[in-house]
């Protein structure tokens, strides 16, 4: 374990549907891969890329969310999730939405961290919320988490339906984490800009650690085959440019959508109205329809309150904006 980041230094991140203390139940192995990203920032895309490298092809031994579970998510008993991971003989790769300061940093483990323009992530989260079966999520959560351990009732009623514009205003102005003892506040709706930039910031200050690597949604869009070579190098997996080009065809959004029941998260849990809609469009710039000129100005003022210029350049444009290797 990296002595610079012992277990006692972790921030506790407990929200309505996730608890990073669940990681304490898992014994990490030499060669494990942990993939961390804010919601709707390319985590599933990255899982697919890593799966293509680990299995050297498109076939999986089961649904991706079983092979590579979101360990923190409180809709499956942690004993069941750990038993599945302990039984795996291949190189393990595990999903989390926990910021890096909420994880144990282990020198034997590779940490693959992913970013996306926060505005695009928020739009994608807005559509994902509409695709989610909240009643099913509530049933699963309450079956796993004892009443006295629940942070708050999941999916509490907002009192009135909010427009996308209202959602985005709340997202932009939401509180800065972490409050004492808890990493994220009890959020409603699509979360907050502050949470996204906080999570990316926990990676940014650790990006020069030898086992931490940053990837970006925009870079995937620009050159998917080229980006597939980057995790191959980070993870020590041999792959030629030609092989990466062959494998990348299975990680396009169209290809993943065509196998949504296998690739989308939680498909075996029945939480989506449509598995295919999880891979909605995957584009950039849809946020512009929700932002007035005044909100554009407020957004730029807000992000400069929350993060330094180099991180903001990378967060919005990937390596074209700023190379995190610098």
UniProtKB/Swiss-Prot annotation:
It is an enzyme of class 2 (transferase). GO terms for molecular function: sulfotransferase activity. This is Glycolipid sulfotransferase MT1418. InterPro entries: P-loop_NTPase (IPR027417), Sulfotransferase_dom (IPR000863). It comes from Mycobacterium tuberculosis (strain CDC 1551 / Oshkosh). Pfam families: Sulfotransfer_1. Coiled coil: none annotated. The active site is at 97 (proton acceptor). Gene3D superfamilies: P-loop containing nucleotide triphosphate hydrolases (3.40.50.300). 3'-phosphoadenylyl sulfate binds at residues 40-45, 116-124. Its EC number is 2.8.2.-. It comes from the Bacteria. Keywords: Transferase. Involved in the synthesis of cell wall sulfolipids with activity towards mycobacterial trehalose glycolipids and eukaryotic glycolipids such as glucosylceramide and galactosylceramide (type I and II) but not towards eukaryotic 3'-sulfate galactosylceramide. Belongs to the sulfotransferase 1 family. The lineage of its organism: Bacteria, Bacillati, Actinomycetota, Actinomycetes, Mycobacteriales. SUPFAM superfamilies: P-loop containing nucleoside triphosphate hydrolases. The keyword Acetylation does not apply.
């Amino acid at each position: 374990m990296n002595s610079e980041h012992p277990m006692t230094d972790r921030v506790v991140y407990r929200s309505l549907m996730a608890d990073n203390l669940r990681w304490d139940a898992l014994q990490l192995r030499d060669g494990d891969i942990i993939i961390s990203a804010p919601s709707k920032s390319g985590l599933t895309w990255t899982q697919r890329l890593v799966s293509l490298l680990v299995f050297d092809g498109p076939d999986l031994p089961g649904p991706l969310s079983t092979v590579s579970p979101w360990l923190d998510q409180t809709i499956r008993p942690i004993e069941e999730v750990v038993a599945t991971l302990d039984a795996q003989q291949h190189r393990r790769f595990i999903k989390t939405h926990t910021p890096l300061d909420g994880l144990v940093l282990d020198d034997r483990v590779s940490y693959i961290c992913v970013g996306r323009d926060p505005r695009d992530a928020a739009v994608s989260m807005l559509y994902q919320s509409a695709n989610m079966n909240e009643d099913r999520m509530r049933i699963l959560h309450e079956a796993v988490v004892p009443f006295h351990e629940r942070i708050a009732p999941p999916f509490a009623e907002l009192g009135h339906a909010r427009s996308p514009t209202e959602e985005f205003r709340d997202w932009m102005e939401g509180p800065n984490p972490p409050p004492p003892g808890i990493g994220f506040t009890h959020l409603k709706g699509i979360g907050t800009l502050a949470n996204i930039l906080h999570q990316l910031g926990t990676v940014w200050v650790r990006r020069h650690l030898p086992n931490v690597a940053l990837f970006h949604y925009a870079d995937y869009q620009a050159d998917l085959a080229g980006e597939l070579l980057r995790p191959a190098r980070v993870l020590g997996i041999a792959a030629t440019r030609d092989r990466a080009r062959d494998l990348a065809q299975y990680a396009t959004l169209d290809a993943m959508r065509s196998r949504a029941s296998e690739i989308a998260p939680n498909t075996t849990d029945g939480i989506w109205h449509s598995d295919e809609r999880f891979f909605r469009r995957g584009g950039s710039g849809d946020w512009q329809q929700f932002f007035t000129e005044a909100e554009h100005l407020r957004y730029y003022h807000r992000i400069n309150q929350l993060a330094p210029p180099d991180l903001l350049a990378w967060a919005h444009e990937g390596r074209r904006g700023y190379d995190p290797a610098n």
